[in-house]
Amino acid sequence: MDTNYHLYDRVIEHLHAIYGDQITSGIDALASDVIGLMGLDPKQNVVNQVRNLWDQKEIVMITYGDSVLQRDIKPLKTLKTFVDKYFSDSISALHILPFYPFTSDDGFSVLDYSKVNESLGDWNDIQAIANDYSLMADLVINHCSARSRWFDNFVKDQDPGRGFFVTADPEDDLSGVVRPRLNPLLRETQTAVGKQHVWCTFSHDQVDLNFRNPKVLNAFVTIIRQYLDSGVRLFRLDAVAFLWKELGTPCINLPQTHEIVRLLRTLIEYKNPNAVIITETNIPNRENLAYFGNANEAHCIYNFSLPPLLLNTLVSGDCSALKQWMMSMPPARHG
């Protein structure tokens, strides 16, 4: 290990790979910003250690915060009581689907990442759950609500929010953009600086965030720090494959997206070596597996093909399709 190679140097490498010549003069300041926002020492030595943070014995329960209700008690408290009573010997981790204020898409159109939806409870309830179970939270990183403070400030041309969202010209050639939804990609919006067309991969209530703007990166580093401090151990990166946009490309799985995942892994691992990143990338198998990187991106990824193949095997009594698929999978990695 090179004792002269520090966390700061690694972050600089990530940022150069993400932004290229876009912010050459400000790259040092940005590196200092993200390291400081995460509460890390820039002179900390880099340790290239890959170890298993989970295995086949890990059982994760996935639930909404209000799946279990009890009169006059906040749902997160009820959920904790319910899990303690019935599942404490069965599960090791709890994935609470978006527990933030939201406007649509069952929580995935976030109004404010820094708050717990008051109808569910508060951060003390989240911390109480994290004290007894490994807690997974969704980092809805590609987009946020069109009614969020950020987007309201974007419309007003104020901070924080100015320049936070992807825009495009309707005359641009967007024919190659990969779309998971059928709604028009661009939404016309009147702003303080004139008419703009904002990019909406999923719905017009979910406006895509502009990671070309380093302020957006800083905002999410701040959010991640808050989640870690509140006990979150597992981070589900929602719709991360769509994160970076580049005209003339499919705008999915771009190199900058992979590099942002690498940067987040570096920062998260140094803040909490036991933290885990899982990418929600519902894409073809080869592209999905690429989010492992070289043991430097996601620790784990969703295997969307497996559940329907298992059902097919059980219903048909024929395991040939499952076996063929398993033969195409690479050996399991550390992580």
Regions found by a protein language model. Give the residues of each.
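Acidic/aromatic-lined carbohydrate-recognition and catalytic surfaces
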Residues: 2-221, 229, 242-313
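Active-site-proximal substrate-binding groove within the catalytic cores of carbohydrate-active enzymes
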Residues: 64, 326-335
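Hydrophobic residues within beta-strands of alpha/beta enzymes
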Residues: 94, 235-237
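Generic structural signal for secondary-structure transition and capping sites
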Residues: 134, 319, 331-334
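An active-site-proximal structural segment forming one wall of the substrate-binding cleft
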Residues: 213-235, 322-330
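Extended, charge-rich low-complexity interaction segments
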Residues: 309-319, 323-325
